[in-house]
């Protein structure tokens, strides 16, 4: 089961929380579509800023958006000029008051989404897929992750028949629910078609207070 399902969804409320935090009754579908619009817009708008994830909270008519990015300086801009423009664009998109909170990703080499996006960009520039995968694996292991797995699928190297190639180093225990596994999917648009890039990063086990006491004894 752990091999098939999304590693993030199966670990909700165990090692990670929801990306959208709000409650709605009759407006549920409206808010859900708004969240999708916000994420799609930000992914396109901040494609050069190393955007890792977007967390959305709602209170009344206000929307609070947390952006986790590897390059906060690009998002904020000189004297906060860029973030003000971005805020106005988002308010126009959703017709609500928007508050932005920028958080820096201090170890982008150990962030699954940033690793996947980086490999996808390299494949679009015609870098050999094996070289891109091995470089990402060695960089992640240098930053202290306990295991990493990368899979690329599509017409790799311009081959006539599509296939899937993967590389793994260390442990990536997908069946262990207390394992903190970060997962991401990215797409590389090449002249031969779309190449899918999947990344799993194992950062260690998250133990409860009861388990920590048992380990200490």
UniProtKB/Swiss-Prot annotation:
- One Pfam family this chain carries? Ribosomal_S3_C
Cite the Gene3D superfamilies for this sequence: 3.30.300.20, Ribosomal protein S3, C-terminal domain
Which residues are in the KH type-2 domain?
Answer: 38-106
Q: What's in the keyword line of the UniProt record? A: Ribonucleoprotein, Ribosomal protein, RNA-binding, rRNA-binding
Give me the segments passing through the membrane.
none
- Would you indicate the residue range of the signal peptide? none
Highest taxon listed in the record's lineage: Bacteria
Which molecular function GO terms apply here? mRNA binding; rRNA binding; structural constituent of ribosome
Provide the GO biological process annotations.
translation
Q: Identify the GO cellular component terms for this protein.
A: cytosolic small ribosomal subunit
Which family, according to UniProt?
Belongs to the universal ribosomal protein uS3 family.
- What is the annotated quaternary arrangement, including any partners? Part of the 30S ribosomal subunit. Forms a tight complex with proteins S10 and S14.
* Function comment: Binds the lower part of the 30S subunit head. Binds mRNA in the 70S ribosome, positioning it for translation.
Name-wise, this protein is: Small ribosomal subunit protein uS3
Query: What species is this protein from?
Result: Desulfotalea psychrophila (strain LSv54 / DSM 12343)
Q: Which gene encodes it?
A: rpsC
């Amino acid at each position: 089961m752990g091999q098939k399902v999304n590693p993030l969804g199966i670990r909700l409320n165990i090692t990670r929380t929801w990306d959208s935090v709000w409650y709605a009754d009759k407006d549920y579908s409206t808010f859900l579509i708004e969240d999708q619009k916000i994420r799609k817009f930000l992914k396109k708008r901040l494609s050069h800023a190393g955007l890792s994830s977007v967390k959305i909270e709602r209170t009344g008519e206000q929307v609070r958006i947390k952006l986790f990015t590897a390059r906060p300086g690009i998002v904020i801009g000189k004297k906060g000029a860029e973030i003000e423009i971005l805020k106005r664009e988002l308010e126009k998109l959703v017709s609500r008051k928007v508050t932005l909170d920028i958080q820096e990703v201090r170890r982008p080499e150990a962030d699954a989404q940033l690793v996947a996006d980086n490999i996808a960009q390299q494949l679009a520039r015609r870098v050999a897929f094996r070289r891109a995968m091995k470089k990402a694996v060695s960089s992640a292991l240098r930053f202290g992750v306990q295991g990493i797995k990368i899979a690329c699928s599509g017409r790799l190297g311009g081959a006539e028949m599509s296939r899937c190639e993967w590389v793994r180093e260390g442990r990536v225990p997908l069946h262990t629910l207390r394992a903190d596994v970060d997962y991401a999917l990215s797409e590389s648009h090449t002249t031969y078609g779309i190449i899918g890039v999947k990344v799993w990063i194992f950062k260690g086990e998250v133990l409860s207070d009861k388990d920590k006491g048992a380990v200490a004894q």
